[in-house]
Amino acid sequence: MDPYASAGVDEEREQDVFATAMRPWLARTTVRSQLVTSITGLASGYFATLMHVPPGPPIALTTDGVGTKILLAREADRWEPVGIDCVANNVNDVICTGAVPLALLDYIATDRIDAAVLEAIARGLYRGADLAGIAIPGGEIAQIGAMLADSAGGGPMLDLVGTAVGAIPDGRSPVDGSAVRPGDVVLALPSSGLHSNGYSLARRALGPRTRELADALLAPTRVYVRAAEALWAAGVTPRGLAHISGGGLLNLARLAADVSYTLDALPPAPEIFALIASAGDVPAATMYATFNMGTGFCVVVSPADAKPALNALTAAGEQPVVAGSVTARPGRYVSIPAAGLLGQGDSFFPGGSDPPHTPPAHGGAARPPIPPRDTV
């Protein structure tokens, strides 16, 4: 059984149920609005949804939570990082459309009111909002103790979720990855660690060591808004933007172009990933399909824009690396030669051979993966 599924996260089942049982109903809602006159062609599975509400610009919408990282925050009684995570997870998805994040609403479900905990989360939300340049004009606290059983004592049991909105500035076209071409350059921005994904597997692998590794495990998700805006300010038009969250580097396959990616010079992975792999005997294919492995965000640019993009990102405080390139191979494969892995859809496979998936008959292109709806 897949180690991540054994840890309680069955991604394949989740994606199948979303595609067959939920998406057909949710898709129908878009035809009922009297305000929305057009919806961009972003495929279901992209990082955020773009909607056009005349007379204003296209707006980007997304929602995400912090997942079971909250259990480690509770264990360590360190809540501020998850507030930052809540903001980062959402705004990093918004910027993948080319939109500028504007605001976020937060939702906290808790078994009881603990003023110190809520203040720490609020500080984290503030810090994240400051890094992203957004407002948090409202939110909700729901006291649902009957639904959140406290089985281990200690601080409150809670869940933290955000919904973010952004807008495409005048004169800027939305980004969906359809402009990506073979020969384009993939730039990678380092992560701070796990960010907010794979914590069910990490907790299972590390067991009681999570306490001694709290500093590494609770490092907040990096916010890449300033980096993205630095590109536009420098006159660089990115052809693709990918938030490397749940699903790891396979998130590149969510870009619209039917191409593939070879990543042969990724940023170094923080030590915490090797500790998880060793402690839990987790194979490389699962590690790369679950965690970001040291890369938090990818930017795809034309060869002519590679140097200006590197300069702009460096000036914005990033440490970008030229991670690889785009190839003409159809099917949206992601190759990581150094790890001996080739991936497609939601899985990596060892040995560099073709994965046991075939593109669907309609159109010959592999379906982009459904958005990882797990920050667990």
At which residue positions do the language-model features occur?
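Extreme N-terminal cap/leader segments of soluble proteins
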Residues: 1-78, 126-138, 188, 218, ...
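Glycine-/charge-enriched secondary-structure boundary and capping motifs
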Residues: 2-8, 116-135, 141, 147-158, ...
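Glycine-rich anion-binding loops of enzyme active sites
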Residues: 45, 66-67, 77, 85-86, ...
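Glycine/charged-rich beta-loop-alpha catalytic/anionic-binding loops adjacent to active sites
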Residues: 65-78, 106, 209-213, 259, ...
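Active-site pocket-shaping loop/turn-to-helix segments
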Residues: 76-84, 214-223
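Alpha-helical scaffold segments that flank or form the walls of functional sites
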Residues: 81-97
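Alpha-helix C-terminal capping segments
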Residues: 92-100, 254-255, 301-302
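Membrane-embedded hairpin module used as a gating/binding unit in multi-pass transport
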Residues: 192-194, 199-209, 224-227
